[in-house]
Amino acid sequence: MRRYAASVALGTLFVVAGAGPAMAESPEEVDPLVVQMLEDVPGGVLVDATHAEWPELGMALTVPTAGDLSARTASGSCASGLICVYKLPSLSGAFLSYSGCGVLAVPGDWTVRSMDNNRASGYAQARNVTTVLATANAGSWTNVGGTTTNIRCVF
């Protein structure tokens, strides 16, 4: 009987532990966009209620809070050295940030409406497969039209 109970407990632990993306403990309710992205893009780790990261992809998601919206800088909220793609025009709304360079995949459900190239050199292109939709030189940003499937970063 003890062996059976231990097997059931261990099996339950494996099922619960492997049920979804890795998540840090947080008393706040996780933003629905963060939950959706963690379900849609494998390998994500929940940082807090409004942030998730995909270490293997060099990608992070940030959903701004009311406080974040009032603390915006001249280059949006994209940290130095990153390329960020925003869901709304003029560097507004939730955004994905990329630390790598090359051809960077944009998740299928993500709509890019503006892009910030907060790198010191080169340029970034929002593209639909190979068609360039918009280009942002180093230290600048641009609004984006059309359906973006990838970002091409060139040093």
Residue ranges and their predicted role:
Residues E25-F155:
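Compact beta-sheet-dominated domain cores in extracellular/mature segments
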Residues M1-E25:
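Secretory targeting and sorting signals
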